[in-house]
């Protein structure tokens, strides 16, 4: 699905409706827009970055967009096909908190080893700070990516092993609403 400008088959629409929080009608509408913007049925990383630039014109979203792109690109072929796009969009826009946090964990776990290290988190947080630019006024204790990451690790890394498991990440994010709010910074595409 996605190679070339093919129409979605009704069986594919049905499957996507079962796999996502979108109705068949919504999937058809999203598909129409996807094919309009990506006539070959593939969204490249450069195209993805361009979309983020529209949402964050005051900052530099290119690094963050690249990180998000890698999570959307499930089969790691260097392009986002419609089914990958709609599944990720479903989780980030309509998923429950656990689903969103699991998705966010995959975003932060850059090497996909099942843990978030301080450096991985710093890469993501730094890219978020670059993306939002000066549009968001941050409190003194979080006005640099390093301070933010230190605060998150102090709160989440319960066993002090300098890495976060999925469980530590979920528990910490649920305990601190500001972290869940910060996670929503990357939902510009779906809001």
UniProtKB/Swiss-Prot annotation:
It is found in: Membrane. PROSITE patterns: EF_HAND_1, EF_HAND_2. Ca(2+) 2 binds at residues 109, 111, 113, 115, 120. Keywords: Calcium, Lipoprotein, Membrane, Metal-binding, Myristate, Repeat. It holds the Pfam family EF-hand_7. It is a lipid-anchor. Ca(2+) 3 binds at residues 157, 159, 161, 163, 168. A lipid is attached at residue 2 (N-myristoyl glycine). GO terms for cellular component: membrane; neuronal cell body. One of its GO terms (molecular function) is calcium ion binding. Belongs to the recoverin family. This is Neuronal calcium sensor 1. The gene is ncs-1.
């Amino acid at each position: 699905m996605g190679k070339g400008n093919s129409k979605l088959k009704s069986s594919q629409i049905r499957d996507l409706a079962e796999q996502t929080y979108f109705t068949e009608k919504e999937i058809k509408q999203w598909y129409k827009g996807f094919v309009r913007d990506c006539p070959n049925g593939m969204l490249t990383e450069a195209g993805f970055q361009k979309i983020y630039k529209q949402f964050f014109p005051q900052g530099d979203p290119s690094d963050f967009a690249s990180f998000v792109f890698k999570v959307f690109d499930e089969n790691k072929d260097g392009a986002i096909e419609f089914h990958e796009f709609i599944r990720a969009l479903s989780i980030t826009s309509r998923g429950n908190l656990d689903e969103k946090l699991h998705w966010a964990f995959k975003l932060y776990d850059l090497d996909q080893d099942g843990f978030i290290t301080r450096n991985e988190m710093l890469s993501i947080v730094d890219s978020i700070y670059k993306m939002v630019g000066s549009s968001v006024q941050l409190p003194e204790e979080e006005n640099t990516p390093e301070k933010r990451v230190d605060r998150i690790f102090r709160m989440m890394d319960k066993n002090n092993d300098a890495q976060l498991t999925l469980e530590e990440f979920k528990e910490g994010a649920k305990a601190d609403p500001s972290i869940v709010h910060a996670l929503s910074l990357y939902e510009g595409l779906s809001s």
